[in-house]
């Protein structure tokens, strides 16, 4: 199965902001962005040249792809579905990305990062409405109950991720019972509930060319 093998800290430095790809490390002063807040590579500290409009749009698309851990072909499919839905395409895009099972598992705190959450899903560690689902791109619907299997509940990494997430608080669109390792996807998030650093309008402009 294809996946992005670029070092995670390098991806964050390329985008110039934290993408929270390495679990708890991203919340400490060991984060690469805290120590080297410039692009990777030989000329990283001198890469301040202005980008074209197309370059800015492409950079934003790459950032969103990396943030959600989605490959190009998958991203295009999600975008096509966002276009078909009623409402604003950009907001639809973010809602669909947040509705992926790996994203929901991450937001519920079952994994410390989306990569960890994706692995948990693939290894049959997650139930949706009482049934095992091992497809990270599975679309979670409002009202669906997502929970850890009995086996995954006892994993130290999962316990640590849940404790850290509970201390930070959970998103409003989720109802999470951290002790039970279970949560309900109440609704798709509103745009105001998602990171303001994302500019989905640039992606819409890019694909409208």
UniProtKB/Swiss-Prot annotation:
Domain called S4 RNA-binding: residue spans: 99-164
rRNA-binding in keyword set: yes
A GO biological process held by the record: ribosomal small subunit biogenesis
Keyword annotations: Ribonucleoprotein, Ribosomal protein, RNA-binding, rRNA-binding
GO CC aspect terms: small ribosomal subunit
The keyword Ribonucleoprotein is annotated on this UniProt entry: yes
InterPro entries (alphabetical): Ribosomal_uS4, Ribosomal_uS4_bac-type, Ribosomal_uS4_CS, Ribosomal_uS4_N, S4_RNA-bd, S4_RNA-bd_sf
A Pfam family that the UniProt record links to this protein: Ribosomal_S4
Molecular function in Gene Ontology: rRNA binding; structural constituent of ribosome
UniProt record similarity statement: Belongs to the universal ribosomal protein uS4 family.
Assembly and oligomerization: Part of the 30S ribosomal subunit. Contacts protein S5. The interaction surface between S4 and S5 is involved in control of translational fidelity.
Role noted for this protein: One of the primary rRNA binding proteins, it binds directly to 16S rRNA where it nucleates assembly of the body of the 30S subunit.
PANTHER family the record matches: 30S 40S RIBOSOMAL PROTEIN, SMALL RIBOSOMAL SUBUNIT PROTEIN US4M
Protein name: Small ribosomal subunit protein uS4
Organism of origin: Aromatoleum aromaticum (strain DSM 19018 / LMG 30748 / EbN1)
